[in-house]
Amino acid sequence: MTRDEFIRLVGPLVYHVTPQTNLQGITGRGLIRPAEAARQAGFDPADIALRTDPETIVSDAGPMTLNHQKPLLAGQHRASDFLTAGTLLDWALQLDERIFFWPRKMRRSYIETLQARVPVAVLELDAGGLFDIYADH
């Protein structure tokens, strides 16, 4: 996929939603995957997987609050319906190895449901710049 094709698909900006308390760490170290945050703080990523509540990890670059994984846990009894291999823990570990971006700004109602738990920030990132950095990955 070319840079232009990527921008045509996702638009000129992509968005990342994060608790406002994460902004200090993002400024200090950039966006990192939850599993990497766990490793940097000396935890095994499996220790933070399948979180029932938001979990804050503290490393040298500052705190990072990870969202809960209640949607996964709510579907636990039906995991075989959506997992073709592995366990729910395996899936949670895969999700924690990723950073999620949205191709368009979320509806206000979606952001409000997140903010009901904790104040959030919506980060806007240049899609072309993101492609330039990660196209080879």
Show where each model-derived region lies.
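ADP-ribosyltransferase catalytic core
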Residues: 52-137
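ADP-ribose/NAD+-binding catalytic cleft of ART/PARP-like enzymes
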Residues: 1-90
